């Protein structure tokens, strides 16, 4: 049978045994990829600096997903939080990778078995002897089992009743750790940033799934609905399954890009909106103001800012700064962060404090403009020096550092002041090592960006797949020219439309 490449799946259309076999093989491939990718990432991951070189800076993709579900330790003796461990047990990064690979192998063998032994009694209709599946019943079974898994995850794993809990952090991604979460049953459970909503929603959705599954197992669909929605056709299952998958893909693309309790910034990096809104900058200034109110000096107040918080307030960690086709981790772009130089405070010769206007997300270059606290431009780095009025040299701008490695250091020579003014456009200033990885200095996106792009793209493609297969199954008789309710034996070639006596062909 010479099938074109896009029609090859028709070989399992009326063969339930081999349809099952190819799905088991698909599960083997997915699980095998996950385990293999985890082992590869563990081979290249450097856990030595969780503050300035976290997993998302190194381009880790599957390690964050394991971590948010409660895996924190490695057989290599390290912990994701930076400490050391002596007995991580089976539920370590390597243990999870190994279980996926073992499961993949078992699925591989099961797929071969079902491909060879395809003609099982369970797949044949005892009345007709032909292969058939009771699709509404199978739907009920799967819905029930999915409900049990969903309920179990929310009630046991997330709550810590029987499981580790999940990764929970503060709003600024500083204190994250794996902990048990109590379900949030009030209105706060609908806040996407409240971890308790994860537990309560899984419990509620799981309960609904169990009840719906039992309903579909005990109640048969009405005949008119069964025929109208083509419930006996396997392509109906394909179409509705694709719908479920593309809907889920759109949802997770949104929760990843805009941020939520399920995508902590410690594991996936900050969102672009935190840069756009000056989210971390405002928190840093709030902490400094509180320090000054407690009679700390400016230097002492800035020195109390956690390096982790300062690092979030750097444009190189904005996932929207990386081009879609720039391969590699963030570390391959601007380099590996080594240390925070400190916060630069600029002043003109009249003693006014000046603030460098920060670069918006979608700019690659941006004019260096320094404004005072009222937003009035007081200094800049001009494009044309001949017409400049506010140049650093003319205004006499100086810079002094507070906190970080350059704490207490000040510069007045224009070249150095301009250098740090340019770097201040990008947020807090860090020393970056570009030599180790031969980093090219061009920003890369974080796994947050890749995940969003991949899932949004595939969701769109799968949406079209849903429309395609849904139309094929609903209008199959129209496309084929055969009435599905036609019981009479028909002769191909007698009529222009098969089985329709009103279209009898004329003898030539």
Swiss-Prot record:
Gene3D superfamilies with a match to the protein in the record: Photosystem II CP47 reaction center protein (3.10.680.10)
Species assigned in the record: Hordeum vulgare
Membrane topology label: Multi-pass membrane protein
Gene label: psbB
Subunit structure of this chain's protein: PSII is composed of 1 copy each of membrane proteins PsbA, PsbB, PsbC, PsbD, PsbE, PsbF, PsbH, PsbI, PsbJ, PsbK, PsbL, PsbM, PsbT, PsbX, PsbY, PsbZ, Psb30/Ycf12, at least 3 peripheral proteins of the oxygen-evolving complex and a large number of cofactors. It forms dimeric complexes.
HAMAP family (alphabetical): PSII_PsbB_CP47 (MF_01495)
Subcellular location: Plastid, Chloroplast thylakoid membrane
Primary localization: plastid
Protein name stated in the entry: Photosystem II CP47 reaction center protein
Pfam families recorded: PSII
Keywords: Chlorophyll, Chloroplast, Chromophore, Membrane, Photosynthesis, Photosystem II, Plastid, Thylakoid, Transmembrane, Transmembrane helix
Role played: One of the components of the core complex of photosystem II (PSII). It binds chlorophyll and helps catalyze the primary light-induced photochemical processes of PSII. PSII is a light-driven water:plastoquinone oxidoreductase, using light energy to abstract electrons from H(2)O, generating O(2) and a proton gradient subsequently used for ATP formation.
Recorded family membership: Belongs to the PsbB/PsbC family. PsbB subfamily.
Segments traversing the membrane: 21-36, 101-115, 140-156, 203-218, 237-252, 457-472
GO molecular function terms attached to this record: chlorophyll binding; electron transporter, transferring electrons within the cyclic electron transport pathway of photosynthesis activity
Residue ranges of coiled coil: none
GO annotation, biological process: photosynthetic electron transport in photosystem II
Cofactor-binding details, from the entry: Binds multiple chlorophylls. PSII binds additional chlorophylls, carotenoids and specific lipids.
Gene Ontology cellular-component terms listed: chloroplast thylakoid membrane; photosystem II
Domain of life: Eukaryota
PANTHER family linked: PHOTOSYSTEM II CP43 REACTION CENTER PROTEIN (PTHR33180:SF37)
